[in-house]
Amino acid sequence: MGLHLLCSPQMADDAGANRGGFRGGFGSGGRGRGRGRGRGRGRGRGARGGKADDKEWVPVTKLGRLVKDMKIKSLEEIYLFSLPIKESEIIDFFLGTSLKDEVLKIMPVQKQTRAGQRTRFKAFVAIGDFNGHVGLGVKCSKEVATAIRGAIILAKLSVVPVRRGYWGNKIGKPHTVPCKVTGRCGSVLVRLIPAPRGTGIVSAPVPKKLLMMAGIDDCYTSARGCTATLGNFAKATFDAISRTYSYLTPDLWKETVFTKSPYQEYTDHLAKNHTRVSVQRTQAAAVPATS
């Protein structure tokens, strides 16, 4: 007597996912052109966590100390003075609840050594709050999880403000890019063009994810070059988005009154509360355990 096994389509999909391994075969089949939708869906702050999230943040830079002591109230104050952000916790402090991230692609890269080929994994991660802030991170590591984790940190450090505007009359909230902007990486050139309200984002899947995370609702795009190279395509789009604040429009021609940099304004506070946290951590890690 033969045995007949019945399985539902959901069980078959789960079995295929378990066999597939690294998120759709490392981007095979389509080169990031939209197949395997929802690969990174749900990868918000709630998707990852553990012991690292339970620890209290101890800032190690002057900017981090000013942020934690509530001397700096928003990210815009940091961008106004072009202060470099060296700690990803600063972005979590301001955008923690609204920040979402998505893995664009994971691909294997190889290096020829004397012992043979060394394979590592390269992760591309986009991050944004869907309201005027977006970042892109690229990380290569021996393990997929380590690469994704490192790419998320680098994406947070690269978060930039996004300038939004109107296509026609200034009615309602800004919904598109204020002017035509162009970004480039390698041979890929991406151009963002303002669009009427209700048009949506007319683009390939990769720029569409970045533009949605940036909070742009309507936009036309034009791309040329080898757009099949997902890394350069994403970097060119991110470059175009970051250039929205690189030019002046007539409404910004009026004279800007600059104030003191936070480092100058809170010099006494930084000098009074200074502690060498990084040195203490290094010494504690270097002390061997004796029984």
What is each stretch, according to the model?
Residues 2-291:
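Ribosome-associated RNA-binding proteins
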